[in-house]
Design a protein with these regions (language model features):
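Domain-level detector for long C-terminal conserved domains
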Residues: 2-59, 63-571
């Protein structure tokens, strides 16, 4: 906290062990890499060959949720055309604990399941993603997905992946668990089991989510963090919102929603519903030591213990992932000095747009104040081309959900491969392996894992070939030539405990780490005008004033949010 802060400094939450969501907008990683390479080519006055149809590989280090995977996968056809190659996009996911990795699997499983209508699937996804407590129907969905994951993933671990009922499951086709050790596989299966309900008449497992009260667990966390400010926590929340959230440019987050999350853990309200069930995907293990005695140096000593409970973030809201940025800038329109939409509505729009593009193969477009009729038809009906070709527009509009997402959706998921990396020593167990040297087009590092930006991480990014060297990919020696990898680092702009000075220092430190890893910031281009729908392309308003221009520094790429910093591989 800065020295000009009017309140006493509050330290980081010492009981914040697991990170279940990021603090930055979702990225289309393929688009970011393309923009970075284009900026680099412009700066060097050198044309770069386009390899948009080449396989795309990404390493995600501590991104905490699958927002980048969902967005990149949904918009893939914008870069490669209508046909997606099988397993043409590979995502390697590293998290610091297995419960965080298991949550990636759960959230993607909810999106890829075709037994729910799209609109309901969006609600369930956001509810599981954002809320500490769930509706009863959503809790049943989590148990159903957990049973499915336990059955399919267990069969994969047992070498039965070729069985017809397992091989045809999207979970088996999309996820790769071959990089996990036996102990990590056991931990993953234990996560799935802990999400399931206890059988009637059974004593159950001590790790079952039904033995925990999320409200009581959060209340203990809040009492410990706020201490003597607990009775005035609503005032602290108000200060954090006005001096951190709104001041950082995230005013689209409504204060009512932010306060509801901070006080109750419910960030995504669903109409007038109640949330009586604990969200089991937010429960995890924390390890520590008891304070039983002090040694001669007056240091606390005791037994090593583990405790299962709610150890997630209670300060930073999950709205930044899908709710603070969108392609449709009309969602951020201001009328009468009030925002027309809020972060909850923007989150619904972004997830719905991604799911629609997965199903229809084209972007979600809005006409006037609402959604195009053709878009709504494809959203409410099955979009299989062979079926849709025989239906009129009115028949499509009146069609009911048939429980199948069609060929386009199936092809979208066949193009993806998500490999889970175990929460071990990343550098020794993964980055040091020869097969991953210069293997990734992009590496995304979360703000909580900035210390993992090391020279070893830089070595797994694709490097430019020089002289007579060639890089052969699938037998093509020209397609991959001169393709540099991109390092994308999440900033601390939206951390409620970091002021502008601390965020700037964080950017400077990550830039130093990136340079040591063999990467340089993408050269800054000309400043771009701020988005303002009431201003014409000339940049001059009706009153004669000019549209303000957004400052851009090194690493901030045009068309990409200013929370992330992008660095290009230099050698």
């Amino acid at each position: 906290v800065g020295t000009n802060d009017p309140r006493p400094a509050m330290s980081l939450d010492p009981h914040h062990v697991h990170n279940f969501w990021g603090v930055s907008p979702a990225l289309d990683l393929r688009d970011v890499v393309r923009r970075c390479r284009a900026d680099q080519a412009t700066a060097e006055e050198e044309a770069r060959p386009d390899a948009s149809d080449a396989p795309f590989s990404t390493l995600l280090v501590g991104t905490n949720d699958p927002r980048h995977i969902v967005t990149t996968l949904a918009r893939a056809r914008r870069h490669v055309g209508p046909a997606l190659g099988e397993r043409s996009m590979t995502f390697h996911v590293y998290e610091s604990s297995m419960v965080e990795a298991a949550r990636h699997v759960l959230l993607l499983c909810v999106l890829m399941s075709d037994d729910l209508p799209p609109s309901e699937r969006v609600e369930r996804f956001l509810e599981i993603f954002m809320n500490a407590t769930l509706r009863e129907s959503t809790a049943e969905l989590v148990e159903t997905c957990a049973a499915r994951l336990e059955r399919v993933v267990g069969a994969m671990f047992a070498g039965e992946a070729d069985a017809p009922d397992i091989a045809n499951d999207r979970v088996c086709r999309v996820f790769d668990f071959s990089l996990l050790k036996f102990k990590e596989k056991d931990e993953l299966m234990e996560c799935f089991r802990s999400w399931r309900a206890e059988p009637r008449g059974s004593r159950g497992s001590s790790s079952s989510a039904h033995r925990f009260d999320a409200d009581a667990l959060r209340d203990k966390r809040l009492r410990k963090y706020y201490d003597d400010r607990y009775d005035h926590r609503a005032n602290v929340v108000d200060w954090d919102y006005n001096m951190r959230v709104d001041a950082a440019g995230a005013g689209v987050i409504h204060f009512k929603h932010f306060a509801q999350f901070r006080l109750t853990g419910v960030a995504y309200p669903v109409r007038e519903a109640t949330f009586p069930k604990t969200n089991p995907s937010l429960l995890g293990l924390a390890f520590g030591k008891t304070k039983e005695f002090k040694d001669r140096d007056l240091a606390d000593r005791g037994r090593s213990v583990e405790s299962r409970g709610f150890w997630g973030d209670v300060l930073n809201s999950p709205y930044h992932c899908f709710g603070t940025d969108a392609e449709d800038k009309k969602l951020f329109r201001v009328a009468n000095r009030q925002r027309v939409h809020n972060a909850v509505e923007v989150s619904e729009h972004n997830v719905a747009a991604c799911l629609f593009e997965m199903r229809a193969g084209k972007p979600w477009r809005r006409a006037g104040g609402g959604v195009e009729t053709e878009t709504m038809n494809a959203w409410s009906a099955d979009v299989d081309d062979e079926v849709a070709s025989g239906l009129t527009a009115s028949a499509k509009a009146n069609a009911e959900w048939c429980g199948s997402d069609g060929a386009v959706f199936e092809e979208t998921w066949r193009a993806a491969r998500v490999a889970i990396v175990g929460p071990t020593d990343l550098e020794k167990a993964f980055l040091a392996k020869p097969k991953f040297a210069r293997a990734f087009d992009a590496a995304v590092v979360g703000a909580w894992h900035a210390q993992r930006i090391t020279p070893a991480l830089g070595k797994v990014l694709k490097a430019e070939t020089r002289g007579g060297e060639t890089a052969e990919v699938d037998g093509d020696e020209t397609r991959e030539r001169n393709r540099k990898g991109v390092l994308i680092v999440e900033g601390s702009k939206y951390f409620v405990f970091a002021d502008a000075k601390a965020s700037a220092a964080f950017v400077e430190k990550t830039e130093t780490l990136a340079r040591d890893a063999g990467c340089a910031p993408v050269p800054p281009a000309e400043d771009e005008p701020e988005d303002d729908e009431d201003v014409p392309e000339s940049g001059i308003r009706a009153d004669g004033s000019r549209r303000p221009r957004r400052a851009r520094g090194p690493g901030v790429v045009k068309g990409v949010d200013d929370v992330h910093r992008c660095y290009m591989k230099t050698s």
